[in-house]
Amino acid sequence: MTAELFPEQLERITGYTFRDKSLLLRALTRLAYSKEQGLSEDSHLDALATLGDAVIELIILTRLVKGGEHDKGAVSLKKMDLVNMSVLRDAARSIHLEQYVRWGKGEARMHVWTSGRVLAECMEAFAGALY
């Protein structure tokens, strides 16, 4: 998207208000944008995406085990069904996350958010910021 929306609108959509607004902004900032703008090394979403990936897996695994699933193979298969690029992409699209992300110029020109992988990574970063 060429002009991102205000992050506060995303808070209204999700029903979650960030105490630390800089964390939300970081979760919405792609590395390319950060470099183009000369922002600090810790201003982009990459680390939060890694954290978010782990958090999402932990939540899903906890729910599966608490829900009575105890077979390791079954837990792994169900986790793969519930935590994958398509599910994360769809979750991101449901809140129109791509409209809030600060994309690099090349990313915006190429509409990289149409790639499931890129949008899934943005959703992971958002989850990491929520955590």
Language-model features: locations:
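RNase III-family endoribonuclease catalytic core
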Residues: 1-131
